[in-house]
Every structure is written in structure tokens, then in C-alpha cells.
Design a protein with these regions (language model features):
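N-terminal transmembrane alpha-helices
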Residues: 6-43, 56-71, 75, 79, ...
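Short alpha-helical transmembrane segments in multi-pass integral membrane proteins
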Residues: 1-18, 76-143, 185-240, 297-363, ...
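Hydrophobic transmembrane alpha-helices of multi-pass small-molecule transporters
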Residues: 60-63, 175-180, 205-209, 280-284, ...
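Short runs within selected transmembrane alpha-helices of multi-pass transporters and secretion channels
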Residues: 69, 137-156, 167-175, 193-206, ...
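Helix-terminus/linker motif at the lipid-water interface of multi-pass membrane proteins
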Residues: 30-48, 118-125, 181-188, 250-277, ...
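Transmembrane helical elements of multi-pass membrane transporters/channels
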Residues: 16-35, 137, 171, 200-204, ...
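Small-residue-rich hydrophobic transmembrane alpha-helices
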Residues: 48-108, 145-164, 271-335, 367-389
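Transmembrane alpha-helix boundary and packing residues in multipass membrane permease domains
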Residues: 21, 25, 37, 41, ...
Length: 443
């Protein structure tokens, strides 16, 4: 049974509708996680540290796709809610075209200057060659990866979250199989990991292009794009929080790596990489919920349905709070197993990773509220508040904590920086929720 954006959502219906988006995000995060597991265990900790050093740049560059996907889907969903389907398809086609062109330009520039980039991100010695090789191969599929990020949001806006899930599952399974083949069997090393990811990203980014070009029964399909500067700027504004989130995360992750290189050397970077890979999967569930729920919120906001906005807000907050507690408990219980999967071959590195992950996991209790808060205001077409929450959460507070806490607490200050930053962001998010309730009528 297909669930429409216009329906009233019970807990069961809301979770059924959003679950495909959550699974999509989890499988997307698996790309880098599987690479990390195979590289760490089959190639070694130097190669593993190299992937961790270049990953912030690659994820930062792909932020264009998240910005256009989340910001554009909010605007397109609002337009659909207003009953303007033809206009919505024109906007959709324009935004995908812009993402493809922008992705191609960034891919070419990144490929050319990759060696300089990896050195700027802290690579030294033999790590430079590892980083450059992995980065340049990844650039080949960077445009497809951006389109994949765009379509994650637009599949939901089109009323086809299950189809988006199938595409991502296919891409994720491809990545896992090829990692095992290229690294475990053929021993291609770090290049094998990059080729596996490249292939899976082509599947995730290009299959949706084929679908939306063909006749389909979804709410969206490709038409002749007409450039509308106002719509593009509004999309950038709406999606600025997601852009800021990804760019800030890239900068902060690079800062974490630089700090850890000073305090603990290569082992510190490898330990942080293992923690972040697990974090990708855990946080992906919150991101998936936010992505899946945003078009529904935008639709009812565009339709002026205040009662359903209240319903969606209250149910979402309850779900996220409960899930945060579950993730925190799971992280504490599974920390030994998860750490051993990545770095079980080195006793000292394993101990550092285990301790770091348990401290880091405290943030899971509240991180979901902050992610939802930013996405919620994006869905309401209030890009400014969304961007402020995202800017404080992913950049300002984390940078301050990563730079200052280690002065007093050493490496423990690095592990606890995320929790303190999320707590400070929660205070600001709560203030925005309270102050904006009369304007948007969600409380």
C-alpha cells in the first residue's frame, strides 16, 4: 500500500513511510565503512589512516548534492502541495541539471589538484601517495555520488521512497561484493577500495536518472529544464544548513585528524577513523529520518494543514528521543565488538578505539534532536534558522571544543568534544523551537 504525502500519519504509518530513507542513508554510509574494514584489515593501518585523511575532503565536495537535494525537495514538495505539478517538475529537472554540471566541474578540479589537497589535509610521507591514489579514483564517480545524494531526497518527494531504497541497496551490495573481490581476493589494495566505491556510486547516481527520464507513475519526472534564478537561490538558502553541515563536518574531521596526529600520531588517526565509521552508520539513522520526514512536513506546510504539522512534530520528537537512548545503549554494549572489527589486529590501537568510542557515544543521546531541528526548519522553508543550527552544531561549537578541551584533558578532550558541542546546540535548538511555534503552528 502506497502512503501519500497528503495523508494523516500515525506512528506506524510515519515509520513505514520514513524507513526506506533511513535504510538508504545507512547503506550510503556503508560505502565508506566497508572500505574502512577491508583497508584496515587487509592493507594495514597506514592505508586506513590515509583513507581517513582524504575522506573529509571527498565528503565536503559532495555537499553540493545534499544542499540541492534537501533544499530543492523542500521547495518542490511545497510546490506540489500547492497543486502546481508542472512547475514542480520544471524545478526538479533544473536542479538535477545544475547538480550534474557542478559535480563535473568539481570532479575535474579535484582530480588535478588532489596531491596538493591531501598535503593540506595533513598527509605526510607514504600517506601522501595512498591519499592521492584513493582520492583521484574517487573523483571519477564524484558527480554520480552527488546525484545519488540529490535523488535520495527527491525519491521521497516523488512519493517513491521504496524505489530509492532499492537503488541504494543495489549500490551498497555492489560495494560490499567488490570490496571483497578487489581487496580480499585480488589484493588491489587501497585502489581496490576506491574502484569498488566508484562502481557502487555510479549505480546509485545513474539508475535514478534513467528512471526519471522514462515514463513513471511518480509525482516527478524529467521535463525540459527552465532556469529560474529565484528558485535556485531559494534552494541554496533552504539547503544551506545541509551544505554547512557537510562542509563543517569535513573541516572538523580534518581538525580532529590534525589534533590526533599531534597527540597520538598515526594510531590516533586510525582510532578516530574507526569511531567515525561506526558513527556514520548510527547518525545515518537520524539523517534518514530527517530526510524522509522533511517532504511530508513541507507538503503540509504548503497545504496550510497546521493540525498535521503538530502531529508530525510531536511524533517525530518522541521517536527521535527513544531512538537516541537505544543507540547510546547499543553503542556501549557493542563497543568491544565494533572496535575489534576495525582494529582488532593491534592491541594498543584497539584499547584506544574502545575507550574513544564509549566516550564519543554519549552524543547519541541528543544528536538526533539537533539534526531533526535543522531539517525541520529547512522543510518549513526557513533556511536561515536551519543554517544557524547547523553552523553552531557542526562548526562553531565543535571547533572550539576540539581546540580547547585537549589542553586540559588530552586525548579524552578530543573524544568528549562532540558531546559538549551537541549539548550546547541542543540549548539553541530548543530556543528556536519555542520562539517559532506561533509562526508555524507546530505546537
Amino acid at each position: 500500500m502506497n502512503i501519500q504525502l497528503s495523508e494523516h500519519f500515525t506512528y506506524k504509518k510515519l515509520l513505514r513511510f520514513i524507513l526506506p530513507s533511513i535504510i538508504m542513508m545507512v547503506f550510503t554510509s556503508i560505502y565508506s565503512v566497508v572500505d574502512g574494514i577491508f583497508v584496515s584489515n587487509f592493507v594495514g593501518k597506514s592505508a586506513f589512516a590515509s583513507v581517513n585523511l582524504i575522506m573529509p575532503y571527498l565528503m565536503g565536495i559532495s555537499a553540493l548534492g545534499f544542499m540541492i537535494g534537501t533544499g530543492g525537495s523542500a521547495f518542490v514538495s511545497k510546490t506540489l502541495g500547492e497543486g502546481k505539478k508542472k512547475l514542480a517538475n520544471q524545478y526538479f529537472s533544473m536542479l538535477v541539471t545544475i547538480a550534474a554540471i557542478g559535480g563535473f566541474v568539481l570532479s575535474v578540479l579535484s582530480f588535478i589538484f588532489m596531491r596538493r589537497i591531501v598535503m593540506a589535509f595533513g598527509a605526510a610521507g607514504n600517506l601522501i601517495d595512498y591519499c592521492t591514489l584513493y582520492g583521484r579514483i574517487s573523483c571519477i564517480s564524484l558527480t554520480a555520488f552527488m546525484l545519488q545524494n540529490v535523488f535520495q531526497s527527491f525519491f521521497v518527494a516523488a512519493g517513491k521512497p521504496q524505489l530509492g531504497l532499492k537503488v541504494i541497496v543495489a549500490a551498497g551490495c555492489t560495494n560490499i561484493v567488490l570490496d571483497a573481490l578487489f581487496i580480499g581476493v585480488l589484493h588491489f589494495g587501497i585502489a581496490g577500495a576506491a574502484f569498488a566505491t566508484m562502481t557502487s556510486e555510479f549505480i546509485g547516481g545513474l539508475l535514478p536518472v534513467v528512471y526519471f527520464f522514462r515514463k513513471n507513475d511518480s509525482l516527478l519526472h524529467f521535463v525540459k529544464p527552465v532556469f529560474d534564478r529565484r528558485v535556485f537561490l531559494k534552494t541554496c538558502t533552504n539547503g544551506s544548513s545541509e551544505l554547512m553541515t557537510n562542509l563543517s563536518m569535513s573541516l572538523v574531521n580534518a581538525l580532529y585528524n590534525l589534533q590526533l596526529m599531534k597527540i597520538a600520531g598515526e594510531n590516533g588517526v586510525a582510532a578516530y577513523g574507526a569511531v567515525m565509521y561506526v558513527n556514520f552508520i548510527f547518525v545515518a539513522t537520524f539523517l534518514g529520518y530527517a530526510i524522509g520526514c522533511a517532504p511530508v512536513i513541507s507538503y503540509h506546510y504548503g497545504a496550510g494543514n497546521h493540525a498535521e504539522l503538530k502531529n508530525l512534530y510531536k511524533k517525530s520528537m518522541s521517536i527521535i528521543l527513544v531512538w537516541g537512548v537505544i543507540l547510546f545503549g547499543a553503542a556501549q554494549l557493542l563497543a568491544p565488538v565494533l572496535s575489534k572489527i576495525f582494529v582488532g589486529y593491534n592491541t594498543g590501537l584497539y584499547a584506544m578505539t574502545l575507550h574513544g568510542f564509549r566516550v564519543y557515544a554519549i552524543a547519541f543521546l541528543i544528536i538526533g534532536i539537533n539534526i531533526f531541528g535543522s531539517s525541520f526548519f529547512t522543510a518549513l522553508n526557513n533556511g536561515l534558522i536551519s543554517a544557524v543550527i547547523s553552523f553552531l552544531r557542526t562548526l562553531v561549537f565543535q571547533v572550539i571544543m576540539v581546540l580547547t578541551l585537549p589542553l586540559w584533558f588530552g586525548i579524552n578532550g578530543i573524544w568528549s568534544a562532540i558531546g559538549v558541542a551537541e549539548a550546547l546546540t541542543l540549548i539553541m535548538t530548543t530556543i528556536f523551537f519555542v520562539r517559532q511555534k506561533d509562526k508555524y503552528h507546530y505546537l
